Amino acid sequence: MQIGNFNTDKKVFVIAELSANHAGSLEMALQSIKAAKEAGADAIKIQTYTPDSMTLNSNKEDFIIKGGLWDKRKLYELYESAKTPYEWHSQIFETAQNEGILCFSSPFAKEDLEFLKRFDPIAYKIASFEANDENFVRLIAKEKKPTIVSTGITTEEELFKICEIFKEEKNPDLIFLKCTSAYPTAIEDMNLKGIVSLKEKFNVEVGLSDHSFGFLAPVMAVALGARVIEKHFMLDKNIESEDSKFSLDFDEFKAMVDAVRQAESALGDGKLDLDEKALKNRVFARSLYASKDIKKGEMFSEENVKSVRPSFGLHPKFYQELLGKKATKDIEFGDALKQGDFT
């Protein structure tokens, strides 16, 4: 799939998710874009919302988080603290362009999408918590841009509906990311085999949005067919933000990108034909040799013929055919047996 100038058929698309790791500082956001590029990310992703496009400013129990990393926090207050302000977007997109890194965002409501459209992003992402909103999904599909959907809390029925909407809107560029909506995610809760299931069941491009510690999961995901990897990125571990607990710093992210590139390189093309290196090593395969001196007219037997390394003699498949045949010439111990040596 083509996302901007990037082709996911050729390389795994690595996304640095900035999210709240700007810690309320535009300067930190801009520095993070430059650092993400240096760390090897193909794209920087931000989030486009206001607390009012996310939730209601209510103190009722429904709007208070229970458990987890943000226990007892009010939803409105959380989103007010974590947002990437609208007024930053122009500088963020401009900086990304200047640094040569792709930039796109997750809008969370119609007004966010309308605002984001002025920057003509290369793609959109739909968070799993918004993926059940069919009207919003259709608005995104109508944009005819590559769209990434996190599947975290989304049901199979909802995922089928998303596919149906994109088909109706004639937008074929859909990517599902396996995602576990726990922050952070325990490695045993990842269910990475779901990547394979998403590909087989929905026939879409697949990847991983990862909230676990470290980067074991992204590397494994590549081996399972992921063509997109999204991971939260932060400048350094001293940053205090809503997402810092499950984010990679510069050194960790760079190490992850290196590991992902090694993993995709190790996968190869899947063909079973021997490559040039393997063909060279065929010299050490077994073949038939004289294990004793053999006189002309003497019969070949288990006593004077052996299948050994290297491979300059007859293929071992001729062993049974050779037994009982007569030597056409004197053969010395250690000679490779050839087609004309028996009759």
Annotate the PLM regions.
Residues 1-343:
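Catalytic cores and adjacent flexible loops of soluble metabolic enzymes
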